Amino acid sequence: MDARFLGLESMFTTLGINSAKTFQMWYNSGLKGRETQGLNIAGCQYAPAQADFTAEFLESTGVIKTMATIVDLNSEPLARGKEVEIKKHEFQIPRQKVKVNFGENDMRKQIIELNKADANARLGGNSPYATVRDFIANRLYDSLAEIPDQHVQRLNFLRGQMFGKHEVTLDADNNQSGIALTLKSAVPDGNIVTEQWYTTASDGAVTYVESADPILTIKKKTRALRNDHYHGYRNITVEMNASTFFTVVEHPKVLQKLGYLVRPEFELVTSNDSKAQTLGKQKLLSMSDELLKEWFKEAIGADELLIDSTIVGAARLDSSSKKFVTDAIDAFPVGVVLVRPSGIVSDIFNVTPYRPDAQDIYTNIFEGRGIIEYFYNARQREQTWISEFTALPVLTRPGDMYYYNVAGKTATYTPVVSPSGNPKAQGYYEKSSTGEYVLTEDTDVQSGKTYYTKS
């Protein structure tokens, strides 16, 4: 069989996709479901589609109700209005695209495979037509499935970064061959706190800051928000990356509280703290993840605890191998704890795509918020599908988002080779008798003494 006689030079022709209507029907029946597979847009809702690329929204603060004025029998109170602080925020909405090509070499490989399928079918006494058609349908599905999958991954990244870092930075690491920019939210600087609970070394080893108390810190914040009727709120969600969560629950102060839960009498004597930590670690190992999350949620006073484990892939061209490699990126960054109102706190602003005329072959995606267009270059014998989806999750309650940057890098101390000058002025360290590194007080280099630089 010559596969060309069945019109297999075009996957669309074989499957009868020759108009926008038939393309839409095929997409809805096969690929539409992938638009929500693995999608994490918790706390978001789609805003109405718009024509321009500028997102605008208004943010208002709470209003404290004032008391009535007490006057004498014949006096009138002063008329007064109500002042509500309203802020206007603007953002630019970036466009994302995916391109899938199917060229002559791909077609030739396909025809070779189809001829093999035809021969096998004939040997078995079967009709080759169903085999060929199924092959084409699967090949098209696998090729175009990349489009909704990649848009889902990008949306996950935008949501995770905006919620976890209160901004999105696009660079060569996560958007190679695309634009480089930073999209900032309107979260006030005062809502962002750096309070290290642990540090991580280059080899992944974790060192806990024992003076920190993660549960107490978050508990005080959730309690303060519930009691603040002006800037606070009642229903509270705490969100963090899964890696952050499982690191935090092994903090000595957290293990201590878990141990006291098992043996409440330990709390009567301070010297029992270490025993409680040991007991807490044993309890931690025996608890299921779901039970642990529920206990932690209750301990910090949250109504909802979201543990984000979404991983997205970033493709980049390796300069040495000249091949594309995929790097894994945490959508919600590690080392951040977010305290926010439960429910919707973000609108996904989206721009209506400019649709071609009725002669073009295209399909709507993501409920009409994006499109996939089909092009065929007869001269180059190349089929191309290009998608367009313009969307950005924007924090619409930025003043209610509170961030704790809780992870740091473990310091490394490197010996100074042939030190000279003033060690103290140069910020050198020395090792104390207890093994700790402390800033030196030496103003002259002491013979036989080792000095260190901190990094």
Where are these regions (language model features)?
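A structural detector for beta-sheet-dominated domains
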Residues: K87, P94, N101, N115, ...
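N-terminal alpha-helical "arm" segments
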Residues: M1-E56, Y402-Y403, A411-Y413, S455
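Long, contiguous amphipathic alpha-helices that act as assembly "spine/axial" helices in icosahedral shell
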Residues: F91-N191, E210-F245, R381-E388
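Extended, solvent-exposed, turn-rich assembly/linker loops in the middle of proteins
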Residues: Q176-W295
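Sequence/fold signature of self-assembling virion shell proteins
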Residues: L255-L439, T443-T450, K454-S455
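Assembly/oligomerization interface modules of large self-assembling protein complexes
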Residues: N40-L123, I179-T182
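Helix N-terminus capping/helix-initiation residues
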Residues: N74, N101-G103, N241, S288, ...
